[in-house]
């Protein structure tokens, strides 16, 4: 088992190669084709849209998303992509779990210290556990939080932890707007609920009086099966990419046989382009206008932020 995180050079390479990580058929599927292109499109770019549409499942087509007829032992093949802005997110991917932490900025402190502390503690717990020990996401997060508090780290962090146990049970614990979605047959079947005091003020783990701590943490579980795709990330992902857009990217990636790393890079690269697009609305911008409809000023386009993406593809344990 090993810690798998991007190094600084890999992050820089991701930024340099962002446009190459996002195929034009993905851009066409999510409405970015007129804003970012890596190749010159034909006179009628409808052919690119048609090509993209060929990979997408019709909206009217409903897929059953129960536990499946045959329960099969599965495992996670995971990878990540991190595109920094303030460079205050932290994450890691482990054979037993995927863990993501997003900063909660405070004036005068290292905003990323708390999220990095959470990740360091959680990872240390995993690598020192006996092989085969089931991972309880809530307990892992709770212990990591306690150790981070004891370290004296300032600031705060949202977090999400996912693990696979009992052969085919996906378990999770999260707090704030670090989030996840489980996709089956290209559709979101389970989605975390955003936790916030009010708009753009998420719950978080922190060390000051009045911080929520673990009391508002959400937990749950579901049975997964081969072919499911789990996507976790910080708000930099989900503030810029809607669930419907995430479905399109995953559908195309699945049809093209993307590896988890390819999928994470494509999702991260697409979210990065969305965050910097002023002409295409993001989920954050839409919600901002709802919350400020009686005020002067407007917010359009994407929301620039650190973007962390973890993708876990559920595969047969025999593969």
Swiss-Prot record:
Cofactor(s), by name: Mg(2+)
Domain of life: Eukaryota
Positions contributing to Mn(2+) 2 binding: 235, 305
Domain called PPM-type phosphatase: residue spans: 73-314
SMART domains attached to this UniProt entry: PP2Cc
Nucleotidyltransferase is among the record's keywords: no
EC numbers, comma separated: 3.1.3.16
Listed InterPro entries: PPM-type-like_dom_sf, PPM-type_phosphatase-like_dom, PPTC7
Binding-site residues for Mn(2+) 1, renumbered to this chain: 102
Example GO molecular function: protein serine/threonine phosphatase activity
Reaction catalyzed: O-phospho-L-seryl-[protein] + H2O = L-seryl-[protein] + phosphate; O-phospho-L-threonyl-[protein] + H2O = L-threonyl-[protein] + phosphate
UniProt-listed SUPFAM superfamilies: PP2C-like
UniProt keyword terms in alphabetical order: Hydrolase, Magnesium, Manganese, Metal-binding, Protein phosphatase
Record note on cofactor: Binds 2 magnesium ions per subunit.
Family in the record: Belongs to the PP2C family.
Annotated protein name in UniProt: Putative protein phosphatase 2C 23
Source species: Oryza sativa subsp. japonica (Rice)
């Amino acid at each position: 088992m090993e810690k798998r995180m991007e190094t600084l050079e890999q992050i820089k390479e991701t930024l340099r190669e962002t446009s190459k990580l996002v195929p034009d058929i993905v851009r066409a599927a999510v409405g970015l084709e007129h804003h970012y292109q890596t190749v010159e499109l034909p006179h009628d770019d409808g052919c690119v849209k048609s090509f993209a549409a060929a990979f997408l499942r019709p909206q009217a087509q409903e897929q059953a998303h129960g536990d499946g007829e045959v329960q099969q032992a599965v495992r996670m093949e995971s990878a990540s992509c991190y595109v920094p802005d303030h460079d205050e997110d932290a994450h890691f991917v482990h054979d037993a779990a995927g863990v993501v932490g997003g900063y909660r900025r405070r004036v005068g402190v290292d905003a990323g210290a708390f999220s990095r502390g959470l990740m360091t503690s959680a990872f240390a717990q995993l690598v020192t556990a006996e092989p085969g020990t089931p991972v309880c996401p809530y307990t892992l997060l709770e212990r990591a939080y306690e150790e981070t508090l004891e370290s004296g780290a300032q600031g705060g962090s949202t977090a999400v932890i996912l693990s696979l146990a009992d052969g085919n049970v996906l378990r999770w614990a999260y707090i704030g707007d670090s989030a996840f979605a489980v996709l089956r047959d290209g559709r979101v079947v389970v989605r975390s609920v955003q936790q916030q005091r009010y708009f753009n003020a998420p719950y978080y783990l922190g060390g000051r009086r009045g911080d929520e701590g673990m009391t508002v943490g959400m937990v749950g579980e579901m049975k997964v099966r081969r072919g499911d795709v789990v996507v976790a990330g910080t708000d930099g992902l989900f503030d810029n990419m809607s669930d419907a857009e995430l479905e399109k990217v995953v559908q195309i990636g699945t049809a093209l046989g993307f590896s988890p790393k390819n999928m994470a890079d494509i999702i991260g690269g697409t979210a990065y382009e969305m965050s910097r697009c002023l002409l295409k609305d993001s989920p954050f911008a839409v919600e901002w206008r709802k919350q400020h409809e009686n005020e002067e000023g407007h917010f359009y386009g994407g929301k620039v932020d650190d973007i962390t993406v973890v993708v876990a593809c559920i595969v047969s344990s025999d593969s």
